[in-house]
Structures are given as C-alpha cells and as structure tokens.
Amino acid sequence: MLKDLVREKLLTIMNTKAYTQFNPEQLLQLENEMKIYMKSGDSALTEGNYFFLMEMLFYVLVYRNQDVDAQVVYNTLRDRLGENSYKMVIMKATLLQINGNDKGAIEYLENLLNDDLEYETDFVTYVSIAKKLIAIKTTSKNLSQESVLKEVVALTDKFPLDAELWWYASEIYFEMGQFEKACYCLEQVLCITPFNYACFGRLSETLYYEALRSKKQTKTELLEKALKNALRSVELSELYLKGWALVNIISRELGRNKQNDLIKLSASKLKEISAKSNNKDKITAELILNKI
C-alpha cells in the first residue's frame, strides 16, 4: 500500500511537472524520496513509468547542480533506450549546456534539425528539439529578443497547436510592451487549452496593462475585458491568488468603491488564501491585502 501511494505521488509530480516549481529544499527531499523508492523494487512499477521517473530524477539532479549524478542517470537511460529518442537528445543537450558548452549544445541540436529531420520525424520530436534549441540560445544570449521571437513565430506557423509556443511568444511580446500581440497569443493558448486558469489570469493581466496606456473609452472596454478574464480564472481555480488580486485591482481601476461586491469578495478570498495556502502565496496575499 505504501509503495502504491509513493508511486502515484511521484508519477503525479512527473506528469504535472510540479518539480519545475520546487524550491531547493523541496528538490532535495524529492531526490531522496525518489532514490529510496527506485531501490525499493516496486513490482507494480511498469517499465514505461520507470523511465518517466528516471527522466524526472535526471532533471531534479540538474536543478540541484549534481552534474555527475545526472550524467550517471543519462548513461543508464542511454544504455536501455539508445540515443535517438527526442527525450534523450534533449537530455544530452542539457548535459552539454550545464557543463558550459552552450555552443556544442546548439550545434548538436542544429545538426539534428535539418530538412530531413523536419519531414521524416513526428511532430513531438521536431518541436521538442526546436524548443530546446531556442531555450539554449536564449539563456546563452546567442540570439537577440527579436531573433528569438522570429524563430518562435516561425514555429507557431508550422505547429499552430502547440500551446507552449504561443505562451512563449506572448511572454516575449509582453516584455517588448506589445500587449495586443501578447493577448492574441494567449487567446491561441486558450483555444488549445480552454480550462487553463493561469492563462486566463495572464490574459487579464496583459489586458490590464494595455488598458493603462489607452485612451479613456478604450481603457474602460479593455478593463472590462480584463475583469471578465480574471473572473474566469478564479471560476476555474477558486483559490487562484493572481486571479483574485486582479479582480480587486481592476475593479478599483474601474472606479468601484470598497463596498462593491467584487471588491469585497476578492478581499475575502485573498484573506482565505493567506490563511490556507502555501507560504509563498500566504506572504504574497498578505502583501496585497496590506496595499488594498
């Protein structure tokens, strides 16, 4: 029974990619828990799930700067799976990257992303490798922001159903202050993932910033639209901190007083979040409450 619970917990963390948001202490705890579990000999662990968990262990070790241990995990998987799957390709590029060889990682991936690979491989393989290449170029400052955006937009033309590409494009447009284009990209994300509460929150935030620099009539229209998206985000996730903060801020920007139902409700929800949520959300909620 205990092994069943641990297995399901670890697989859930892997499938949701929750570990990518863990702090150093949580990563260390996860690493130790995984190593103990993997040595426990769980007969109910399928081969496929074994590889999934080993993949997560690899990235946990990378995040913790355990380069040697990460290499050992990679070697274990390579001996079992070979080097040709896109996940192994991305792992190899990651190892090159963390060992300070960004140029080698870029050349390795670019050599794979030739015309033959584009047309001979499946969608997941090509787009996954292409996204990894862009990520390395971005962190290594190999490309300007405009060049990165050009590559991402080119990929959205080829793979319009990849929500992550549209999200990445929206983030770049947002940083460049091109809020209208950022909103368009976020709307594409919602067409693909219609229950993505975080995306509704980000769209609301982007519309809010666009409204702040717009003329009065347009500003009100944009704020109303931003409020609608913020409300949708908290409809999908009742204790979504960012969503309730936006509901409060946008309602105030629209000129509503403290007795307004939405302002009272959002303040109440922020208090609930400060009492119930994780430490990070608690602190953030309390800071917001102090300002309102």
Swiss-Prot record:
This is ER membrane protein complex subunit 2. It is a peripheral membrane protein. The keyword Cell membrane does not apply. Present with 5740 molecules/cell in log phase SD medium. Component of the ER membrane protein complex (EMC), which is composed of EMC1, EMC2, EMC3, EMC4, EMC5 and EMC6. It comes from the Eukaryota. InterPro entries: EMC2-like, TPR-like_helical_dom_sf, TPR_rpt. The lineage of its organism: Eukaryota, Fungi, Dikarya, Ascomycota, Saccharomycotina. One of its GO terms (biological process) is phospholipid metabolic process. Gene3D superfamilies: Tetratricopeptide repeat domain.
